[in-house]
């Protein structure tokens, strides 16, 4: 087995695993976890888990929300090719409406970690809430801008969900999902009032619920 050295996968400005008190010199692996799609009115919430390979650096990692779509798409392919392992998971619209968005997000995170081919000995999660996991975990606020593995997870989750929204647009072009990605923009809210909700809309979210009530006979 090849020896592990301190991680070189972080982009300039991101702290190394050793600076975070984590080291490849001890047995085990570090996974980063992040989500995409908590705020939209439609579609699943997506989570990703990534274990990076310190001998295959990925340059340019950062918060997916501040990267251009072109850069995210390029990094998506590079992360999938170079990571030791990764997993993208979802919680459905039905699960969101049944559990609430927070619990559905934590469920998607659990599924992403459980789907990793390798078992991490620690999981770092973006934000301030942790899913229940079988391994030690730590929540890191703004972790997608601080930790390379979380940044990689945020990119995988964001790109995957954006692609789902393109598919939703093909099925329901009247809502404009390709543009707003399900977020409550004025155009999306106007389309909801005109066309009502489709099967991809989250009925538990107030703007959708209000439209459904308005359209009751």
UniProtKB/Swiss-Prot annotation:
Compartment(s): Cytoplasm
Catalytic activity: Endonucleolytic cleavage to 5'-phosphomonoester
PROSITE patterns referenced in this protein's UniProt entry, alphabetically: RNASE_H_2
GO biological process: DNA replication, removal of RNA primer; mismatch repair
InterPro entries: RNase_HII, RNase_HII/HIII, RNase_HII/HIII_dom, RNaseH-like_sf, RNaseH_sf
One Gene Ontology CC term in the entry: cytoplasm
Primary localisation category: cytoplasm
Cofactor note: Manganese or magnesium. Binds 1 divalent metal ion per monomer in the absence of substrate. May bind a second metal ion after substrate binding.
Enzyme class per UniProt: hydrolase
Presence of the UniProt keyword Manganese in the record: yes
Chain sites annotated for binding a divalent metal cation: 34-35, 126
Enzyme Commission code: 3.1.26.4
Superkingdom of the organism of origin: Bacteria
Pfam families reported in the protein's UniProt record: RNase_HII
Function field: Endonuclease that specifically degrades the RNA of RNA-DNA hybrids.
Protein name, entry field: Ribonuclease HII 2
